[in-house]
């Protein structure tokens, strides 16, 4: 081996070996335990970012470790290739989304290969390819036949000037991104999948996932939002209309003072027929497009409809108001308002002078002031007829029973979860496989017509989807009769909901999945991705697995046994303010820094000498120009160094602060490992280790080696605290660099230690370890080596080093047998020449012994 560590020479050679020998190709083998490790696949945006590198490094470390344990490891890779950004980029670069996407995939694949990830590239998937989305289209038609798919009108962002639907990202401050026309809310027919049919299974399944982060499970539970309540029907006075509400607080029913309805509720339209002021308010509320997350903070607005609901128990007339905080797609689109016991209802009632009736009082003697805020806790009932004095449970059941007997109420379990709207009025997505016949009937496309291929050679004008603009594209026939293809495309979450399963059989042509392959590899053993996917992708991923199970493709209930959510990668961000008061962000790579003695930044300047504001460590992003290019870092330091820093700088689930000084430190450490192997290689051991001929120092060094092996095995395998595993190897390296290589047994102990160090580092820094493994005289490649095992006997200490203090000050250290009792330790300690100086002619007051560690002798003259 050469004397200097040169990653630029080592890494390409090792990567070529892996590629030529298909080292990471996974083949089903029933005789071996399988391990399926999967990192969430990326959107091919053009360049890898450090968030990608962190995700895939974690996955690669786990995969390589599991392979060394003897498991049959599958680590595939692919591309979540459909999506809106491709359309914007195509318009900007005057190209087609497909061309832009495929170029990005090719470039990013080269970047990934530079980092040495052990992917099985034979299983590569790009979701924009017809051989992938064909089966998604087919599955959708099967779900339709099962009654799990339906079409209904739903609200979209509509630009009246361009006559086109806009994604949320294309609406800037309420206006169209392209022509600046105010955006309207428009109802159009869209396709939905009945995820609500699986709400209870999705909720219950969370209890079977002990190795998923609690935070993800809590977020999913809240998103599914199971509640038990009562649906109550009110008659509308002087009409034949009825209005239904759902409440989880029937105990407050006698305190209802008004009903709130959504702007899109049929009663609102009825009331607005002869009321132009109300009609204008309704239109304004519809166009405002309120997200559920904004409900708590937005200004509450409303207008009376002039209609009244009849309270089914008291006969009281309750005014019906259109309220901007009631959403048509949530619940029934109407709410019963109890201002005394709901803060939102209280604020609305105060604003519009509506009645506030107390029907709950605190159980304890607590002072409440209903002129200032609502009392929202459970309590006992007042002003509630025969239910006065009852607690929450008694009142819930009593009032629910009464409403059910009267035929105006029914107990109901509701979910916050809504059905999954999968229609997108965009071009770059998989076409929805439904056909409209001349008589208006809508039917699924037959299998022989699939895939319905998205044309790739298109011109983007930035207004209409090419398949909507080209009227001929939609024209087709079914059984010889004219029909029209659906011009909406699938939500891209469709593709990412089943890709993990297709990886088990990506070339399979006879169906969506090869059940034999799928059931060998699935469920995924380890899934890795950001927590930002908790309530979208990770919920659809679980839902789709249950759909695949019910279709007979898989036998497991959940798609992944274990989930790791890696933290974000942060970097310093710097800016200056332009003459127009705009923040201009400067890349950290262009910034000259001055630091104080503690390493804190005290001054930052750009290449023009401008003083910059340091806005701290923030998530790497294009908007703040603080992304660090992984490729540049690999070229500068080597892939192994980048990988090592990524795994060492922070626990995997926590944010990671990018510090180039830390990267330099990682490079220095690998240089030390290289140097130690090089020094050993100049005079290697010629005989094998003789455990019966070891000196005390050699035994201690061996003990440190095997303790490190045990810790690293536990840290990587069970705890997944990769940073502490690396720290343990670094600590061991400090001891090894000081160890003697003089005797044959010294060198034999070092040979064992270096073999262990190289194997422990291999999952993290595979290129250098590949080379060092060969330098240590191993004939086969390290890729097939077994994980190093700790020798339990070596870790047993037959001797202990005892620190001896006299009156709290260290006066000596003595070696005793590991099983020595206190009297033996005292005898040996008191015989130590240095200790004797401080206790001779002194009166021993007491002796404190901390077993196996410390002896403190308290003396006085």
Curated annotation (Swiss-Prot):
Sorted alphabetically, the Gene Ontology BP terms of this entry are:
leucyl-tRNA aminoacylation
- Does the record bear Protein biosynthesis in its keywords? yes
- Binding-site residues for ATP, renumbered to this chain: 622
Tell me where it resides. Cytoplasm
Which GO cellular component terms, listed alphabetically, does the Swiss-Prot or TrEMBL entry include? Answer: cytosol
Motif 'KMSKS' region: residue span? 619-623
Q: What terms describe the molecular function in GO for this protein?
A: aminoacyl-tRNA deacylase activity; ATP binding; leucine-tRNA ligase activity
Keywords associated with the record: Aminoacyl-tRNA synthetase, ATP-binding, Cytoplasm, Ligase, Nucleotide-binding, Protein biosynthesis
Please give the catalytic activity noted in the UniProt record. Answer: tRNA(Leu) + L-leucine + ATP = L-leucyl-tRNA(Leu) + AMP + diphosphate
Motif 'HIGH' region, residue numbers: 42-52
- EC number in record: 6.1.1.4
Broadest EC class assigned to this enzyme: ligase
Q: Does the keyword Aminoacyl-tRNA synthetase apply?
A: yes
Family matches, as InterPro entries = aa-tRNA-synth_I_CS, aa-tRNA-synth_Ia, Leu-tRNA-ligase, Leu_tRNA-synth_edit, M/V/L/I-tRNA-synth_anticd-bd, Methionyl/Leucyl_tRNA_Synth, Rossmann-like_a/b/a_fold, tRNAsynth_Ia_anticodon-bd
Task: Name where it mostly resides.
Answer: cytoplasm
Family statement:
Belongs to the class-I aminoacyl-tRNA synthetase family.
Q: What is this protein called?
A: Leucine--tRNA ligase
Organism of this sequence: Haemophilus influenzae (strain PittEE)
């Amino acid at each position: 081996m050469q004397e200097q560590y040169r990653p630029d020479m080592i890494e390409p050679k090792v990567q070529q070996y892996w590629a030529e020998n298909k080292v990471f190709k996974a083949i089903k083998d029933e005789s071996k335990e399988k391990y399926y490790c999967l990192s969430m696949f990326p959107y091919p945006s053009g360049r890898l970012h450090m968030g990608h590198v962190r995700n895939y490094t974690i996955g690669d470390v786990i995969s390589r470790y599991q392979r060394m344990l003897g498991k049959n490891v599958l680590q595939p890779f692919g591309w979540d290739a459909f999506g809106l950004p491709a359309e914007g980029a195509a318009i900007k670069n005057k190209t087609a989304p497909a061309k832009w996407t495929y170029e990005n995939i090719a470039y990013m694949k080269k970047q990934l290969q530079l980092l040495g990830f052990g992917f099985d590239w034979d299983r590569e998937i790009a979701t924009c390819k017809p051989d992938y989305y064909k089966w998604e289209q087919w599955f959708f038609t099967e779900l339709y036949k099962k009654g799990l798919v339906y079409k209904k009108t739903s609200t979209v962002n509509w630009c009246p000037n361009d006559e086109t639907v806009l994604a949320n990202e294309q609406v800037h401050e309420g206006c169209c991104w392209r022509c600046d026309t105010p955006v309207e809310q428009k109802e159009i027919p869209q396709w939905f999948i009945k995820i609500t049919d699986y709400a209870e299974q999705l909720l219950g399944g969370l209890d079977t996932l002990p190795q998923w982060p609690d935070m993800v499970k809590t977020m999913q539970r809240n998103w599914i939002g199971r509640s038990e309540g009562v649906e109550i029907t009110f008659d509308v006075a002087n009409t034949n209309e009825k209005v239904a509400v759902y409440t989880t607080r029937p105990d407050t029913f006698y305190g209802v003072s008004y009903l709130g309805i959504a702007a899109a509720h049929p009663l609102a339209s009825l009331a607005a027929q002869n009321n132009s002021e109300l009609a204008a308010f309704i239109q304004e509320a519809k166009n405002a497009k309120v997200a559920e997350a904004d409900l708590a903070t937005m200004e509450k607005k409303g207008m009376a409809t002039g209609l009244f609901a009849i309270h089914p128990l008291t006969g009281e007339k309750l005014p019906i108001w259109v309220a901007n905080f009631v959403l048509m797609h949530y619940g029934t689109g109407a709410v019963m308002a109890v201002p005394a016991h709901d803060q939102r209802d209280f604020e609305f009632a105060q604003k519009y002078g509506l009645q506030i009736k107390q029907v709950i009082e605190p159980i304890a003697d607590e002072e409440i002031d209903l002129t200032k805020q609502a009392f929202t806790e459970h309590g006992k009932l007042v002003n509630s007829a025969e239910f006065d004095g009852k607690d929450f449970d008694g009142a819930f059941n009593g009032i629910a029973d009464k409403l059910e007997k009267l035929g105006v109420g029914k107990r109901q379990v509701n979910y916050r979860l809504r059905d999954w709207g999968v229609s997108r009025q965009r071009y770059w997505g998989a076409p929805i496989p439904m056909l409209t016949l001349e008589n208006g009937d809508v039917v699924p496309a037959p299998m022989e017509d699939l895939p319905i291929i998205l044309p790739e050679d298109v011109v983007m004008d930035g207004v209409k989807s090419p398949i909507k603009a080209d009227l001929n594209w939609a024209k087709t026939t079914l059984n010889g009769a004219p029909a029209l293809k659906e011009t909406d495309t699938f939500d891209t979450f469709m593709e990412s909901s089943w890709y993990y399963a297709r990886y088990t059989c990506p070339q399979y042509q006879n169906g969506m999945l090869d059940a034999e392959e799928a059931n060998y590899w699935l469920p995924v053993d380890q899934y890795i991705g950001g927590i930002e996917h908790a309530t979208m992708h990770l919920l659809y991923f679980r839902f789709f697995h249950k759909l695949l199970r019910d279709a007979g493709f898989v036998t497991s209930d959940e798609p992944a046994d274990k989930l790791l959510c890696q933290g974000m990668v942060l970097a310093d961000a710097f800016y200056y303010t332009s003459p127009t008061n705009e923040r201009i962000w400067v890349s950290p790579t262009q910034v000259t820094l001055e630091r104080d003695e503690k390493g804190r930044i005290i001054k930052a300047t750009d290449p023009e000498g401008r003083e910059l504001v340091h806005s701290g460590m923030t998530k790497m992003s294009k908007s703040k120009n603080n992304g660090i290019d992984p490729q540049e870092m690999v070229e500068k330091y080597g892939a192994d160094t980048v990988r090592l820093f990524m795994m060492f700088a922070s626990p995997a689930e926590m944010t990671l602060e990018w510090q180039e000084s830390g990267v330099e430190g990682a490079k220095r450490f690998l240089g030390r490992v290289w140097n130690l192997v090089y020094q050993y290689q100049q005079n290697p051991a010629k005989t094998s280790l003789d455990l019966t001929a070891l000196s005390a120092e050699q035994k201690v060094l061996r003990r440190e080696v095997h303790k490190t092996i045990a810790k690293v095995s536990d840290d990587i395998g069970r705890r997944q605290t990769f940073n502490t595993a690396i720290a343990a190897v670094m600590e061991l390296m400090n001891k090894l660099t000081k160890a003697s290589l003089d005797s044959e047994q010294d060198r034999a102990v070092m040979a064992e230690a270096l073999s262990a160090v190289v194997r422990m580092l291999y999952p993290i820094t595979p290129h250098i370890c590949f080379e060092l493994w060969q330098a240590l005289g191993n004939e086969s490649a390290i890729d097939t080596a077994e994980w190093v095992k700790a020798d339990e006997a070596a870790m047993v200490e037959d001797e202990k080093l005892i620190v001896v203090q006299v009156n709290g000050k260290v006066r000596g250290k003595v070696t005793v047998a590991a099983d020595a009792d206190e009297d033996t330790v005292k005898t040996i300690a008191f015989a130590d020449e240095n200790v004797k100086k401080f206790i001779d002619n002194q009166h021993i007051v007491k002796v404190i012994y901390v077993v196996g560690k410390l002896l403190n002798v308290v003396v006085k003259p």
